[in-house]
């Protein structure tokens, strides 16, 4: 009797088990991180849009539950180590700037190779997405070489130049120590300045102690990292809004996720990508006003100064494209597509670069 009852209960349990996947009974934990802190717009959107939206939609539309373990501002990975953090599985999802991967992702700074592009982050991320969609290598390289999947592009706000000294023409910058990150250091080099590689978390102390006297930076960085305290001058030179950050997920972790959870992550990531454009664009004028209110001298230089700087860089895009082409990368194709996409969107270059 007891044996019969036991067999019956085991049979029922087996039926229930077969009907209910093990994964449906598990909580999915994902570690998400960035070396930058939440005062950065894209990290703020990771924390306050991507994470809660994925959590909510998975709970509402599936039998699963997602819990995120969050680590920003270098708590889990540093700014220059995030690609490797995702690659190794130390974290599952990472947001980072390709500027810190000049060897691993040299072509992904392609908008930087065409300075004085659109100052609209909305337009920038749309242009970048159009190019990524036409050149599969740009997305596939993450999976093929770095064991991660690119799920969103991230736009920055428009880059300008903040300094602790006043300047009015490009020649005023000659010999000045100015900071940047990755390939945008070339903008400084061609202008005659002394470029210094740096990152936002160290910017305040570096300017305070005279390591350098200015930064290629968008206004949110000048506001949120209080750089106005050590750099009184913020000059709108209009280098362009650059899309050269990304959000990636470890490939092995991705493969283990249920299909419906994958679909929701991609859905939210697409919205997140668009928001990096719209939120940055909405905040730009507010941040300039905030800087003025804090005593910063905010000026917009005449178009002829912008054109002079562009002329100093006239041959660089073609040179850089040839250099990367020689490494087997589709650089000339990517730069040509970017120029065309920007012009189709209505952008007028101060100098029309020739890359072929």
What name fits each language-model region?
Residues 125-139:
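Signature of the catalytic double-stranded beta-helix
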Residues 1-5:
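Positively charged n-region of N-terminal signal peptides that target proteins for export
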Residues 25-125, 140-356:
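N-terminal secretory/targeting leader peptides
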């Amino acid at each position: 009797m007891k044996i019969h009852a036991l067999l019956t209960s085991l049979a029922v349990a087996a039926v229930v088990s077969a009907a209910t996947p093990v994964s449906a009974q598990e909580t999915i934990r994902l570690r998400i991180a960035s070396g930058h802190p939440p005062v950065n717009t894209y990290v703020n959107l990771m924390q306050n849009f991507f994470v809660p939206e994925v959590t909510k939609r998975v709970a509402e539309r599936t039998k699963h539950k997602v819990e995120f373990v969050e680590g920003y501002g270098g708590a889990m990975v540093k700014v220059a180590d995030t690609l490797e953090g995702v690659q190794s599985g130390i974290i599952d999802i990472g947001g980072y700037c390709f500027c810190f991967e000049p060897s691993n992702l040299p072509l992904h700074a392609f908008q930087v190779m065409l300075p004085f592009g659109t100052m609209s982050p909305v337009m920038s991320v749309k242009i970048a997405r159009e190019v990524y969609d036409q050149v599969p290598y740009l997305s596939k390289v993450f999976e093929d070489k770095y064991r991660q999947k690119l799920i969103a592009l991230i736009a920055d706000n428009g880059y300008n130049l903040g300094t602790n000294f006043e300047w009015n023409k490009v020649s005023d910058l000659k010999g000045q120590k100015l900071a940047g990150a990755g390939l945008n250091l070339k903008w400084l080099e061609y202008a005659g300045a002394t470029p210094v590689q740096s990152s936002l978390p160290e910017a305040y102390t570096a300017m305070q102690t005279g390591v350098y006297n200015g930064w290629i930076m968008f206004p949110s960085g000048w506001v949120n990292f209080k750089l106005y305290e050590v750099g009184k001058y913020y000059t709108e030179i209009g280098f362009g809004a650059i899309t050269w950050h990304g959000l990636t997920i470890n490939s092995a972790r991705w493969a283990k996720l249920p299909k419906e959870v994958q679909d929701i992550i991609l859905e939210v990531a697409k919205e997140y990508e668009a928001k990096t454009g719209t939120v940055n664009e909405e905040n730009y004028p507010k941040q300039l006003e905030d800087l003025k209110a804090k005593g910063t001298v905010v000026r917009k230089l005449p178009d002829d100064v912008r054109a002079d700087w562009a002329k100093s860089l006239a041959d660089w895009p073609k040179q850089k494209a040839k250099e990367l082409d020689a490494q087997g990368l589709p650089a000339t194709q990517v730069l040509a597509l970017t120029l065309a996409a920007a012009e189709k969107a209505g952008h007028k270059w101060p100098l029309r670069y020739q890359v072929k």
